[in-house]
Amino acid sequence: MYCRLNMVYLICALLLIVSLQGTVGARLPQSQKDKEQMLKNVREKIESLQKHYHTTGTEWFGKSVLSSHLHQLNSKASCTCQSLLLDSMLNITETIFQDMRGKAENEETKTSLRDVMTEVKMLRHKYSEEQKVWRELQDIHSVEVNNGKIQKGALNSFLILYDLAY
């Protein structure tokens, strides 16, 4: 559970870093011409890598590692870091209260914890979209990054990812 929370903090920190890049000494290009030049450079590097790793053949067509996740970006409602954190905290709180209820010795305490857990569940219902995003993040996090076939698929899908992330 704490790993999920750490991942949210990391994602939020990365988003903050990227948002600050535009203020001083940005690494990302500022004009359309700069963007086109950077995309051209990246495309040339990717094509060179695709040749090196032999991923230009038709057998690699449609073998993108992240394509299912990329296509879902447009269908997702926008989630904020705050709402992801709140959902995660509510989830952990629910787990804590379940454990406390299991250890409770008297019925009054068990009933109170059950009632509070009902409130937590009602609050979590507000964050159903965030829960879907969490599942997506877990799926992405579980990708076997050391698998050669997956690495080649990631190479082939990078330009799409680059364009969407830009």
Swiss-Prot record:
Similarity section: Belongs to the type II (or gamma) interferon family.
Annotated GO biological process: immune response
Gene this chain is encoded by: ifng1r
Any GO CC annotation of this UniProt entry: extracellular space
Glycosylation positions in this chain: N91
Region forming the signal peptide: 1-26
Superkingdom field: Eukaryota
Main location, first listed in the record: secreted
Localization (cell): Secreted
Transmembrane segments: none
A molecular function (GO) term: type II interferon receptor binding
Species assigned in the record: Carassius auratus (Goldfish)
Subunit architecture: Homodimer.
Protein name (database record): Interferon gamma-related
